[in-house]
Every structure is written in C-alpha cells, then in structure tokens.
From Swiss-Prot:
Organism: Staphylococcus aureus (strain MSSA476)
PANTHER family reported in the protein's UniProt record: HISTONE DEACETYLASE HDAC1, HISTONE DEACETYLASE HDAC1-RELATED
Protein name stated in the entry: Acetoin utilization protein AcuC
Pfam families from the UniProt entry: Hist_deacetyl
Family: Belongs to the histone deacetylase family.
Cited function: Role in growth on acetoin or butanediol. Involved in the breakdown of these compounds used as a carbon source.
Amino acid sequence: MQQHSSKTAYVYSDKLLQYRFHDQHPFNQMRLKLTTELLLNANLLSPEQIVQPRIATDDELMLIHKYDYVEAIKHASHGIISEDEAKKYGLNDEENSQFKHMHRHSATIVGGALTLADLIMSGKVLNGCHLGGGLHHAQPGRASGFCIYNDIAITAQYLAKEYNQRVLIIDTDAHHGDGTQWSFYADNHVTTYSIHETGKFLFPGSGHYTERGEDIGYGHTVNVPLEPYTEDASFLECFKLTVEPVVKSFKPDIILSVNGVDIHYRDPLTHLNCTLHSLYEIPYFVKYLADSYTNGKVIMFGGGGYNIWRVVPRAWSHVFLSLIDQPIQSGYLPLEWINKWKHYSSELLPKRWEDRLNDYTYVPRTKEISEKNKKLALHIASWYESTRQ
C-alpha cells in the first residue's frame, strides 16, 4: 500500500458556486461555501487538503450521457436551443431552467469527482470529499431534479472502465437516486443502494423496493423506501439492517456515498423527521463500511439539502470529519463564521453544533411508522441475502 501524504482530499473552488439556475431557485451552491468556511474557521479543514476540480471532457460525460444531450446542454449554455429541444431534454421549466455556461459549470462538478477518483486510484490520497457534487437525478438523455450531468454515475462508470473497479453507490438522500439507478439497472459491476422517503409522496416517484435491476443487473439495485415522518431511530435502524449485507456480499473495491441532508425535519422540500443525529451518524457508518470492506477507499458527495443556513453546513461538515477520523463535534460554532454570515442569512444562524430541537414536532404515529419501516427493511435484507446464495 502506498503512503498517503494527506489521507483526504476536499474538492473546492468558487467555480462550483456558478452552478446556479436563478436567484430564487432552491438549489443554492452557497451552502458549499458556508460549509467550507465553517470547516476552515473551526480549524478542521486545512488549505493543503483542498484540491481544484477540473472540467470533465465530452468523452467522460458520454460515459453516461448521450451525445445529443451533451450537445443540447452546450447550446442551452448560449441560449441557442429551441423550445421543442428544451422540452425534449428537460430544460423547459423552473426546476431545470437554462443558465449561462451551464455546460461548463456542470462539467466542472463532474470533473471534481473524477479528480478524486484519479487521486485515490493513484494512491495519492485514501479518500475524498466532493460536497459540491451528488447530482443523482440526471438521466442519460435528460435533465431532472436540479441535475444536469450525473457526476456520481459518471464517476462510477469511469472507475469501472478505467480502473476495473467494482463500485457500490450508497445514497441516503431523501429523494430516490433515480438517474443513478437507471444508468446501471442492467449492470453487475456497479451496485446502487438508495434509502429514501417513499416515492408515493415525493419526487421522483420511483425507488420502490421491487425495483431490483434486470438481466445480469438483477440484485444489483437495492431500494429502501421509508414512510413520511420517519425519525432518527427508525432511519438508522433500517439503514444498518439493509446496507451492510449489500457491502458484505457485493464486495466493492470502492464506495461512492451520496450525502443528501434533506432527511432533516427542517428541510422545506421533504417529509422525513430526522435530526442532525442521523446526519452525523450516517457518514461515520459509511466510513466504517469503507474501512472494513474497501481498504478505506470512498468518495463522499453532497446531494440534496435546502435549508442552507441551519442544516447543511453543520451536517456536511461531518461528512468531511468522518473521512479524517475526527469525532462528532459539540459545543459552540466559531464566532468568526457566525459574525460573517448572520448579515446574509434569512433566518437566525445556529450557535452550536447540536440541534436545539425547540421546533421539533414529535409524531404521534412514531411506533406505527417505525414498525412498518422495520418490516420492510427485514424483508429487503432477507430478499437480498437469498439472491446471493
């Protein structure tokens, strides 16, 4: 094993903030800057650990995306796309509205992930963190769910093709990772695992537990849909019941982890009822899985998370902290960070690493929800183990 001069690489550049549909859009990459500055102000991230993203090439994008789609994104970048084309490629609504240089800014997000893949595979670092990425809804030929290019799927395919790696994608975002799933639905070199709020009530409406892959890919797609208002104990129980059997059986060479933090009860777009407790625990458990099964090789992405002031910075900080084996934080946030950003925030900034829970609503049906979730999780774990025999 090669020696790692710095075990963990953290992708950041102000260029990543340019991925912005419009000023009122809920997907706001300012959350990445808030997180990075929080880590720096708390002396938890060293400038030497920061790496710059490159721009992914067209050939790299087309590991997953169709040629005509990539060309359409280029045209949209310069405002020269017809209404019919925009509709065909999912660029005709507020969700995925066109913006200047969208191809370059989207390809930079992909390039950040590929930069980490090369660093890890060359032995220069052990693991990496790309919180500006995690665009799991983008389809091979269509934009979807705030996502233009699917950096996770491209990275998985890149690792499989260039380095002959078996790749496991673990997605804990509140929304089902549909674009990633469909990219590998008939593939047995990449396994996708997604635990999410049921699609009965939430975009994109997919991710049913019966979606299990097809042909040689059967059994390489695992979905764990949870009931609305699921709380910490149930989420973590179902996650641990179902994810480790997948890792143990598939035997990946590397893990790609999607850390959407929209399972938090303060997130405005979802209906789960988790706290920072879950969001702190999840990446540490994924890190344990990587240490136990992939010799520590893991790339952790961002994902959803739309309360950018009170939730995302603290939660995403712990994604990075899990990689560098730092403990979960407690106590006061750096005053320097609070004093800078309180003038920009639309709400009162948190003062501590912990949730105050002063506005947390306990759900009367907690027991019923938890029992239903556990029953499904046990069924999924049993099914999965039966497919591997």
